[in-house]
Amino acid sequence: MKNKLLIFSILILCTSSCNYLEYDESDFLEKDAVFSSFQYTRDFLTNIYSYVPAAFGTIGGDALRSAACDEAVYVDKLSPVHSFNNGAWSAINTLDDRWNYFRGIRAVNMFLQEVEGQEFDELKHNEDYEDIMAQFKYYPYEARFLRAYFYFELAKRYGDIPLITTLLSEEEANMQKRTSFDEVIQFIVDECDAIAPHLPISYKELIKSETGRATRGAAMALKSRALLYSTSPLFNKSGNIDKWKSAARAAADVIEKAWDFGYMPLPDLWSLWNNNYSNNNELIFGVMQREDNWFERVNFPIGIEGGGNTGHCPTENLVESYEMQASGLPVAPDAGYEHMDPSYNSQNPYEGRDPRMYELVAQNGAWWVYDEQVECWYGGRSGKPQKNATVTGYYLRKYVDGSTSLKSEFVTSKRHVWNIMRYSEILLNFAEAMVEAYGDPNYKDGYPMSAKEAVDIVRSRVHVDMPPFPNNLTLNEFKAKLRNERRVELSFEDHRFWDIRRWKIADQTTDIYGVDITKKEDGSFSYKKVLVEKRIFKDCMYLYPIPQSERYINPELEQNPGW
């Protein structure tokens, strides 16, 4: 953690939707000059926002953490993400290294120290001074939210971490010991409680040109997520029921404010990630990308006009988790609970499934852009043995904007919204915490709804229309089906990678399956489930290793067990 106190290099780049800070070594400003200027102070805070990942934690440039769990296989065999799966990562060969969040934390600590009592005297005679100060009053609370978010991202990876809330010298910072995971989570919870009342419900009427900033709901949602993780088996080894109750209460607090905050499950799933941020009533906290076609270039299927590089291939493991729509019953015994739908036909596997599956994958025969069909069968234009063909029999559709053109004569770009927290997650957080705390899916004394009612809201929204959970499920069946619902609803949103760790089931997810598809002489297809990868997972991998480079700098950092 470097200590750079005196100079800042600032280059301001403004767009219609947001403000950025970029550093340029040709321009230098002393610290006092930065924090005596409202413009530079605002840009300093905006730069702290840049530490929030704009895409779900890309590894090696393009791969998502979905390819490091049982959601996907990444087709490029040279991608570093494969080291997650073959056990070739270590404290020296780190992957997804987020220790640099401490830079963001240090920036927050500096920001809070320097802006305290600031009134920007040189602007007091400006006509817009009151508007400026109305914006500025939120800045310290936004910064504290970001610090809490960074600490959560660190804690879920590394467990115990240094907890630093003041600006330290370089020597002091490099002698900090690790604080227990529970203490870090309690700090996050306390911060969220303290800052939430001071943050606005929305910025739409306050600062119309800026979106993606921390709100009251974002602070409350972060508390919900932090408590859910802390009470899960990985971190709650004693099974403390009171922790589950606290997690349920935190999620309930968001649900009870949903109407006031304007949150609701969005019926148009496509709009969750390919729409204007301000029109997304389900989104609680996220990042809007500039217009580009990077994700499409990485993930468009091969073989179609203007095709891409295939990228992420959803697994048969994930596809099997999508139930039959009419019955709500699974198509495989490990997809929820054992009562399978007898009408499911493994040789016509994609008919009548959960509508969310069609938003996730492009399966064999699916229509793609330009009125072309995806041909995943052996010998098809999108299938083996074509170079970069899908290795699982599926292509990724989620987040891919089908209206984007990659044709050489007409290349277009689109905006993407990366959902970091959304309302359906809160409903699922609540359902999980409630059923673990009270052992009854229908219990709701003192709460806005029961676990069953919460999950049924997610399933019953327009354009999903999945049947409610059956009333006759055993407790264990309900829990299994609920975990499957979370897997389905939040697929490719950077949850599954962490869920299988906090539930301590990652060692059960190492067999990765796809389908081999053969086209018959009569034009029909046969489908065969096949093992694609057998991955490696050791107990030490439930937590990341502390980067050895940081331990050389700070000898007080003890390594996580097994690394």
Question: Model segments located where?
Answer:
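Bacterial Sec-dependent N-terminal signal peptides
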Residues: 1-27
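Conserved, well-structured interaction surfaces
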Residues: 37, 42-46, 50-54, 76-158, ...
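Membrane-proximal, proline-rich intrinsically disordered regions
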Residues: 18-65, 551-563
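Long, intrinsically disordered, low-complexity segments
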Residues: 17-20, 98-104, 187, 271-331, ...
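Flexible, polar/acidic helix-loop-strand segments at domain edges
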Residues: 342-423
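Short coil/turn linking the two alpha-helices of tandem helical-hairpin repeats
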Residues: 153-157, 162, 203, 229-238, ...
